[in-house]
Amino acid sequence: LETKIESWATWKSNIVKLRDLTVEKEAATAMKFIMFTKHLEGLDIPGIMKALKSVGVEGADLCTRPGYPVNPDNVDRELPKVAKRFADEGLCIPLVTTPGDFISADIDYAERMYAGCGEAGVANIKLGYWHWRPDGPHYWEYVDTIRKELEEFSKLSEKYGPKTCIHTHSGRDMGLNSCSVMHLVKGFDPKYVGVFADTGHLSICGEPIDMALDIVKEYLSVMAFKDLMRRPGDRGGGVVRMGKGFVDWKLTLKTLKVMNFDGPVSFHSEYREPVETVIDLARIDVRFINGLLQEGIRD
């Protein structure tokens, strides 16, 4: 009888452990992994979908710049078709990246971009970049100008659905880190305006990653995963393989888990290599992050 009781207790304990492990695994994998298609330049839509499946992600951070299959000239017509083709292959497009000069709702294709994304079911639109210049407007005057532009973009978001997102990018970009990007977005409805936080850029000019993500927590909509490093004297940072740069990956993943972040994570894989090599390196990036997630589950 004692043996049976012990066996029952052991079995029950194992079931509880298995349940807890399943819950932790689901929490760790709630984020949706996608890949930035900028460096898949030259591939058509079938080629892009094949690459994404090879990398092991769920979809695309679709580059909608001139020269790509979906671009400002055809986005309202082509993006809904492409989204359907993606869905038929079990893939998704939760984010599009627009041209770097897409910083005004008055630009001729703004309405087309938002309408196309709305019809295609794309949840997030990454804007271009506002650059601070020594001979330009005073910083705070420029902040006011940008916020006026964001008011117009937020109206498009409210009308068509996709959220307007600002990417944290190092250098003299307005919104280069969490504190500065909050100067731009704070006060807007997080339903329509959000932050696209980039681990690499934050690592060279941002706050400690857990602090950085807490600062933008209310507006955090999308993450970019890449690693950067900067040597003394460098004007900017250089992309390196994940785990070789300044990003604290374990703290990043731990913080996102504590925050219950379940949004898209765009693997940027900005390696200046031939497309096939970029695909191979992106696959390694995904494997690297999955490995850390599994370590966290076991710990």
Where are these regions (language model features)?
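Tryptophan (W) side chains
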Residues: W8-W11
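Histidine-acidic metal/acid-base catalytic patches
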Residues: L18, T22-T37, E41-E58, A83, ...
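Active-site mouth loops of central-metabolism enzymes
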Residues: K32-L43, T97-I107, G136-Y142, R241
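Active-site-proximal loop/turn and secondary-structure-junction residues that shape catalytic pockets
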Residues: H39-E41, T64-P66, P99-F102, Y129-R133, ...
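Active-site acidic/histidine proton-transfer and metal-coordination neighborhood
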Residues: P46-A51, R85-E89, F102-V195, I204, ...
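Conserved beta-strand positions in the central sheet of alpha/beta enzyme cores
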Residues: D61, L95, K126, C165, ...
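Glycine-rich, proline-tolerant flexible connector loops at the mouths of alpha/beta enzymes
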Residues: D61-A83, W132-P137
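Short glycine-enriched, charge-decorated loop/helix-capping segments at active-site entrances
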Residues: P69-P72, W140-E141, G237-G243
